[in-house]
Design a protein with these regions (language model features):
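Cytosolic juxtamembrane amphipathic/interface segments immediately preceding
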Residues: 15-30, 81-82, 90, 182-187
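Hydrophobic alpha-helical transmembrane segments and adjacent short intramembrane/lumenal linkers
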Residues: 129-201
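Soluble N-terminal domains of membrane-associated systems
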Residues: 1-15
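Small-polar-interrupted transmembrane alpha-helices in polytopic inner-membrane proteins
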Residues: 43-47, 117-137
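Interfacial/capping segments of alpha-helical transmembrane domains
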Residues: 49-73, 123
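Individual transmembrane alpha-helix segments
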Residues: 84-116
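Alpha-helical transmembrane segments and their helix-start/interface "positive-inside/aromatic belt" motifs
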Residues: 24-42
């Protein structure tokens, strides 16, 4: 009976987290989410403009190998073949692991008083903007929009949401309010961890 009661309690806690606690937490941190999304979108614009006015910028950001491979795929009429160039299982785990790591860094870098999270969001936004403009410049905008956003909408959203979790944690150190700095950090870190846990089904 004791084991059964514990199982029911655990299941109830699980349901409460997903149905009540997480939605309320996301609502209470919508300001940080808006800031994270704003940083990312500004970075996308910066990346696109930089690629427009500096033809070598995309190579600087993405690397010569990636750009050359994409150009070769475009010549072959398969501009988005980069997402299918690996065996399906390897590609899946490679993409998933990379998204998890970027999202984790976006959150963990909040320990650097939120500035680390800003850096991760800026870096990834600039990469996306530069690569998107590069594909536009090559005349494959339509294919790139389908390929990148069909493949990456959830992943990009996860990075932004994880970034908001990093801002929640970092801001708790910068702005403790009526709490001690340590107590505020603990509260902020716990909120951030819960937000990141909410992303697990998306990976």
């Amino acid at each position: 009976r004791h084991i059964y009661r514990n199982q029911r309690t655990g299941m109830g806690r699980f349901v409460t987290f997903w149905v009540t606690e997480l939605p309320l937490l996301m609502a209470s941190t919508r300001k940080q989410l808006a800031i994270a999304a704003g940083i990312f979108l500004i970075a996308v614009v910066i990346g696109g403009l930089s690629a427009r006015y500096d033809t070598d910028f995309t190579r600087l950001i993405m690397g010569d190998g990636y750009v050359d491979m994409t150009l070769e795929n475009i010549k072959e009429g398969k501009p988005m073949a980069v997402y299918g160039s690996s065996p399906m299982v390897d590609m899946f785990f490679g993409i998933t692991f990379n998204n998890i790591m970027v999202s984790f860094y976006a959150f963990a870098m909040g320990l650097l008083l939120s500035y680390g999270t800003w850096l991760i969001l800026l870096q990834n936004g600039i990469m996306l903007g530069a690569f998107q403009y590069f594909l536009y410049d090559q005349g494959v905008l339509h294919e790139s929009l389908r390929g990148i956003w069909l493949h990456g909408t959830i992943e990009i959203s996860c990075i932004v949401i994880a970034g908001s979790a990093g801002l929640v944690m970092g801001n708790s150190i910068l702005f403790p309010g009526t709490y001690t700095r340590l107590a505020s950090f603990r509260r902020g870190a716990l909120k951030g961890v819960k937000i990141v846990l909410g992303l697990v089904p998306c990976f």
